[in-house]
Structure formats: structure tokens, C-alpha cells
């Protein structure tokens, strides 16, 4: 081992030790999924032949995060079926580890206003998710007046829109949507998964769009789904992910970033602990205040989630 390699390894080890030795900050996980594979009629996701086809319940999540100081979670709906909004609310009502849900409704649907009014009566219903999911065409929909009217209703209700699965086109569409509905509270999920294209001009334009979004009030990003496959392998070293995380942090700063695991979908790329370790090692050296913002404070502003347990923090 040469001197440069030794110093690099020592620095990484020092960062890891410092992060793990820092005061335990309470964590609100803003991105988990709940489903029951034994439900009559089956479920739309995950697929039966996949590695995560095992029921994901609040009890299982609570057991999974024991000892990690994860004190609450927001469920992000993983089904396009209308009735599953109520199913999740019923499941969450029984376990205070769940602080709220982002449901699945179609803003352009004829009954959207009625459906939104129904679910908004439940304080655990924090908003809806719409984006690159369930074969939906966000670009086309975001040009439809009826869709825009639905998003305006969402904003008027003081609820949040979560986007799904970022692309350069989706980022451009979200910026345009924010222009049309300035009071919309927007959370862009899984931003570390945004892959650059082969076109440098497209990437430059996307960077400009992100910087524009970062200037708008009520825009947040999830530093979630961080672990990713590269050439068939999933790196577990924080240093590998640092350049992409640095870019996000440089654009959005400490006040707009949120923690989310994407559990159990994250199990495709590593354990819950492995994913958490990477973001803890990245954020903890930034200091207590910045880490608290990432792990729980910003999530209050983004979601207005419900404190249901004494261990859950409140600003």
C-alpha cells in the first residue's frame, strides 16, 4: 500500500467512525412501501417471481430498523388501485410508527376532486404520487388543463405531490408544472438515480432546471434509493456515491433534502443498514444541524406528517 492509498483509506475510515460515533439523530424514513402478498386477488407490485415478494408491514419495518433510531416512516403507495389508498390507511392506523402516506390518485380523473376530499379528511393522507410509474405519461398529462386543475386542488388542500423515477424530461416537466402551480409543494424522489444521458447539452439543461427548481419555495428532493448497480455489482463504499450526492447537495443545500430508504424495493441492492450507512457517512460530517435537517426536520416541512409516537421528533 502506497502513502496516497493509505491516507485515502485512513480518511475514509475516519469519516466512517466519526459518523457512527456521532449522537444518534432520530430518523423519519420518507419512502417505504407497504403491501400484503396474501390479499385476495393479489397485488400489482412486486411481481410474484421477484426477490422482494414478501409482505411488507409496519411490524416488519419496525423490527427491521430496531436499534437504528428510525422512529417513523411515510408510506409511498405502490399500487395504482383506487381501493388500496384506503387499505394502506387502515393498515397504518394500527401502528404509530407510520406517520402518513402518499397515495395514488389520478389528477385528471373525473372524480379526482371527490376522491381527494374523501382521503384528505384523514390526517395521515399527506398527498399523492405521480410520475414515471404505471405506464403513465407525465409529459402528456402535464399539458392537459384537467390535470393542471387537479394539481391546483392538491395544492389548495395543502397536500404534497411526490414525483416518481426521475428523468431529464420529468425534471423539465416538473419545473413547468411548478410555474403553473406556484403554491404546489413538490418532492422529487430518488434523485440519486437520475442517470446522465450521452448528450452533454441535455445534461447541462437538466442541471439548469434543477437549479431553477431549487430556487422555488416548497421544492424538496429525496436523497433516496442511493445504492445502485454498476456492471452487475453494487458498491457499498460511501466514496463511490459522493460525487453524485455532492451535486445534489450543492444544488439544493441543507434545507431541501430528505432521507428515504425505498424499502423493501431497496433490498434489490443491499440491506437497509447498508443504505443507511452510506447516507449517514455522507451527512454526519456536515454537522449536527445539517444532519437533523436531512434525517427529520425537512420532512416536516415537506409532508406535514403526523406525530403519533413519543419517540418521534417535532420542530
Question: What is the predicted function of each stretch?
Answer:
Residues 32, 78, 191, 262-263:
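Active-site metal-binding loops of divalent metal-dependent hydrolases
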Residues 81-169, 175-176, 222-228, 233-235:
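Active-site gating/metal-coordination segments in enzymes
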Residues 83-97, 187, 241-250, 272-282:
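Short, electropositive alpha-helical surface patch
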Residues 5-20, 25-30, 54-72, 246-247, ...:
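Mid-to-C-terminal alpha-helical segments outside catalytic/metal-binding sites
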Residues 27-37, 188:
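Histidine-centered catalytic micro-motifs
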Residues 58-62, 85, 89, 113-117, ...:
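Generic structural signal for well-ordered alpha-helices
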Residues 140-258, 307-315:
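Catalytic pocket-lining loop regions of alpha/beta-barrel enzymes
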Residues 36-71, 121-136, 184-185, 195, ...:
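Active-site gating loops and adjacent loop-to-helix segments of metal-dependent hydrolytic enzymes
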Amino acid at each position: 500500500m502506497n502513502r496516497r492509498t493509505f491516507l485515502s483509506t485512513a480518511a475514509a475510515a475516519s469519516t466512517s467512525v466519526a459518523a457512527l460515533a456521532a449522537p444518534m439523530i432520530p430518523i423519519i424514513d420518507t419512502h417505504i412501501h407497504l403491501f400484503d402478498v396474501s390479499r385476495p386477488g393479489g397485488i400489482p407490485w412486486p411481481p410474484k417471481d421477484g426477490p422482494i415478494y414478501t409482505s411488507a408491514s409496519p411490524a416488519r419495518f419496525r423490527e427491521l430498523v430496531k436499534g437504528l433510531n428510525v422512529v417513523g416512516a411515510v408510506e409511498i403507495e405502490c399500487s395504482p388501485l383506487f381501493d388500496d389508498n384506503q387499505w394502506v390507511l387502515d393498515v397504518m392506523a394500527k401502528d404509530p410508527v407510520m406517520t402518513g402516506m402518499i397515495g395514488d390518485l389520478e389528477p385528471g380523473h373525473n372524480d379526482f376532486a371527490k376522491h381527494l376530499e374523501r382521503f384528505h379528511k384523514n390526517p395521515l393522507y399527506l398527498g399523492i404520487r405521480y410520475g414515471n410509474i404505471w405506464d403513465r405519461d407525465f409529459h402528456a398529462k402535464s399539458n392537459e388543463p384537467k390535470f393542471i386543475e387537479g394539481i391546483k386542488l392538491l395544492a389548495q388542500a395543502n397536500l404534497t405531490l411526490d414525483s416518481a423515477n426521475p428523468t431529464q424530461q420529468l425534471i423539465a416537466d416538473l419545473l413547468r408544472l411548478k410555474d403553473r402551480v406556484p403554491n404546489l409543494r413538490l418532492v422529487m424522489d430518488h434523485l440519486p438515480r437520475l442517470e446522465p444521458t450521452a448528450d452533454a447539452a441535455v445534461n447541462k439543461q437538466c442541471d439548469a432546471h434543477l437549479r431553477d427548481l431549487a430556487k422555488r419555495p416548497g421544492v424538496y428532493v429525496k436523497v433516496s434509493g442511493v445504492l445502485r448497480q454498476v456492471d452487475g455489482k453494487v458498491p457499498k463504499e460511501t466514496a463511490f456515491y459522493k460525487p453524485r450526492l455532492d451535486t445534489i447537495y450543492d444544488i439544493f443545500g441543507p434545507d431541501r433534502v430528505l432521507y428515504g430508504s425505498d424499502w423493501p424495493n431497496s433490498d434489490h441492492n443491499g440491506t437497509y443498514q447498508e443504505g443507511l450507512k452510506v447516507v449517514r457517512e455522507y451527512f454526519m460530517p456536515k454537522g449536527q444541524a445539517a444532519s437533523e435537517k436531512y434525517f427529520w426536520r425537512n420532512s416536516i416541512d415537506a409532508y406535514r406528517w403526523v406525530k403519533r409516537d413519543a419517540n418521534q421528533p417535532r420542530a
